[in-house]
Amino acid sequence: MTELEGPEFGKADFVLLDEVTMEHFMENLRLRFSKGRIYTYIGEVVVAMNPYQPLELYGPSVVEQYRGRELYERPPHLFALADAAYKAMKRRAKDTCIVISGESGAGKTEASKYIMQYIAAITNPTQRAEVERVKNGLLKSNCVLEAFGNAKTNRNDNSSRFGKYMDINFDFKGDPTGGHIYNYLLEKSRVLQQQPGERNFHSFYQLLLGAPDALLASLHLQRDPTAYCYTQQGTQGSAGGDDARGYRAVEEAMAVIGFTPEEVGAVQRILAAILHLGNVQFVAEGEVAALEAVEQLAVLAQLTGTTPEQLRQALLARTVATGGGELIEKGHSPTEAAYGRDACAKAIYERLFGWIVGRINASITARGYDVRQHGKSTVIGVLDIYGFEIFDTNSFEQFCINYCNEKLQQLFIELILRQEQAEYQREGITWQNIEYFSNEPIVELVEQPHRGILALLDEACLAVGTVTDALFLANMDARLGHHPHYSSRKLCPTDKTMEFDRDFRIKHYAGDVTYSVEGFLDKNKDTLFQDFKRLLYNSMDPVLRAMWPDGEQSITEVTKRPLTAATLFKNSIVALVENLASKEPYYVRCIKPNDQKSPVLFDEERCRHQVAYLGLLENVRVLRAGFAYRQPYDRFLQRYKMTCEYTWPNHLMATDREATQTLLEQHGFQDDVAYGHTKVFIRTPRTLFCLEQERAQLIPIIVLLLQKAWRGALARRWCRYLRAAYAIMGYYKRHKVKAYLLELIRRFQGVRSMPDFGKSLAWPEPPAVLSRFQENSQQLFRRWRARQIVKNIPPSDMAQIRAKVAAMGALHGLRKDWGCQRGWVRDYLSSASENPGLALPFAHRVQALRDKVHFGAVLFSSHVRKINRFNKSRDRAILITDQHLYKLEPRKQYRVMRELPLSMVTGLSVTSCRAQLVVFHTQNHDDLAVCLHKTQPRGDERVGELVGVLLEHCRTTKRELQVHVSDRIQLSLRGRKRLLTVETQPDVAAPDFRKSRDGFVLYWPGS
């Protein structure tokens, strides 16, 4: 927190100075710089000193310290300002902007990058992919734009040679959804010429010193900037491999932004073409120019996607259309050809830079943004524009740059100083007027219609006849000589710092600047022969061709005179200032501590001069006498009314002013506020922070209240919908049910008299609600129909019917035949026809057993063939009563050989073929395997009868009996596991058991 900074660091806010004088201001600035405190506040303005060294002030931990904090809660920092602009945008849904100003080399570009870094770090907590794409594009765009738009100057190693304003769009949650970059006045003359100690744009050196050897070979380039006219001036490549690292960083950034490999290759070819174009030299051949080295054309043609002949024609001549539409080809002199070559190189680089900016904008623009879905879109603008420049030789570019800085200073004065004081007067707030320097006369000197320097420059460019730069200067001397901020050698003959017919001086807010008028007219006209435009429009390279849409015009087409460079720049700056004025501004005022780029040297005079012309002292005085925050009463209440019981949810007082006064007095802030006619003014940010804290505590409660009310309304509405839907559904269901039942009655009303009792009738398709009803009805109908059929069966046959039903349930679909179609006798051994000669002995044996164990009934009896303990087949008989299973010896008066309680039988196994094999599984693991034998007629199917009889008996005794159907039966004989299979043998007369490797095989006679 700022109050935790000890007195040894000075005042963290210049507003807290004991005395507001230049001496005290400079003393505090010097002290903080010497202690490594490069940021200091003036209220909500950040004064930033360029440290000229890396500082550990921008890592993730520092970001977390400033996230969501108020300005005064942490030491001064760019992050605090960025967070304040972000919070203001979110809280009030109002567009904000951050204006970064200062002279060249003061650290504006670095400040803009740190602000972008902070905004990217605190947004998109849910890591949405689209938001991450936009953030990465915004961050990486800086790297690309610096490479193509920045250069080393004598004052700054990474000087922005263009102006940049970036709009970042946010959704209602505060996540970035897109952005747009505006660029202003690229210093394209730097492509041709640089002052001693300076360099061309970084992009050329990065390509020459960082590209792989194979790429350089394909572009016909040498790894030597001194080999090319456009890069051999001034100083050369940076030490330490900075250009090589920059090349790799730019390639990576372009890939992240979305440049395709083809587009990157086209950019590299265009840069190489500019370098080669600069090496094209001309010689006189009679009255016209000729190429010094014709072989260069082949390389240029390859790089630009044109032909050598087309290039030669465009470089050495131009086509002029007469008034009658006749075309005349006019050859260039060597001087004219060199001028055309340089104009073409400048224009190509300018169009390339504009195309790159447009390509970045296409990548970061908001996609699919729907206001109804995402809410209102708000914007944070970040302005990083060239600083005030005073060089040894100042030309047209410095004139435009300094004019831009005058306009921004005018905006600062208008918003911070003039409007601030005017608002206090308008609102009736007691106020002590603060004097300040107004640069409005300087701005008017430059841009005033018909009388300003820009108007006179355009007038000279449009004049008929030969007009030179010296004539333009003479016209300015005549028209502007009386202006207090303008002078020249002619007006001040004793001032030998200026040359006659060359120099003029403007007393800017930041100091006096002497401009050389040489080249003003030419740079303002920005002439480029139409032949070059047509040449590049017809290029085979789609990227290069897209940069020259104006080359499509016919040679004879009459077009309007294009606006001059100065007019275009003025219009763009006026639009920029209007855009900034519509937003809530936040300022970063960058100060350059020295010209030696030293991290320890504090140049008192240089810093004092910057503080003076930036108006920082006046800014302190205005804030000391004024208020940090103001808001119309209705908007103030709208935001904070929930913090006071008398204003929530709506006040009953006469005016909003009374309600605001009541709210602030309840919190005890009456001594820190003033009440205007339409607005409330709050002096310190701490008061506002306290209100915000209380509001933040109450918002969740209000949200819950609103959620409860809204959810209740939604639930009630949904309930009404449901009731209506259920009513409709109920009526419709009743209609469908009624129709179904009527149709069902109609179809089945005569079913009792039908021969099949309705078996052949089709049931109507039921509605979904009656599907279960139909299933139950069909089941009841089947039972009713079965009862109708069964009631005609004699009671004596019912036992047989039940047994057959039980057998069908166990064997139907599993065994080919189970004797359903014949009558079941059960006790076959008591039949004289089935058991001739032995029926009587069997009857005696049955009677003896009945007398002994008193069983109730004989369930089944039959001759069988079985396996004995010696694994031999033997003829036996079985008798099954309701209590026991008996194995009998027929040849010995049916003597009982084995008696097995029926309760010991756990299951039966039969085969799927016609073999009459039955295995009785027992609890004691001594199973009985028999084959029904000696049936009359021969081969009669009785397995199904045996199964059905036993199942029906178990059903009546409520005991479960498992029935298995398989052609490979597992059984246990005296505790040992055996496998029993069946084979059909045509040559076997009677069934017979044989031993096999795994157990036994039953050979069944074939048919």
Swiss-Prot record:
Keyword Membrane part of the UniProt annotation: yes
Domain TH1, residue spans: 813-1006
UniProt membrane topology term: Peripheral membrane protein
Main location, first listed in the record: membrane
Domain Myosin motor, first and last residues per copy: 9-696
Keywords, in A-Z order: Actin-binding, Adaptive immunity, ATP-binding, Calmodulin-binding, Cell membrane, Cell projection, Immunity, Lipid-binding, Membrane, Motor protein, Myosin, Nucleotide-binding
PROSITE patterns, sorted: MYOSIN_MOTOR (PS51456), TH1 (PS51757)
Location of the IQ domain: 699-728
Function according to Swiss-Prot or TrEMBL: Unconventional myosin required during immune response for detection of rare antigen-presenting cells by regulating T-cell migration. Unconventional myosins are actin-based motor molecules with ATPase activity and serve in intracellular movements. Acts as a regulator of T-cell migration by generating membrane tension, enforcing cell-intrinsic meandering search, thereby enhancing detection of rare antigens during lymph-node surveillance, enabling pathogen eradication.
The protein's name in its UniProt record: Unconventional myosin-Ig
Gene that encodes it: MYO1G
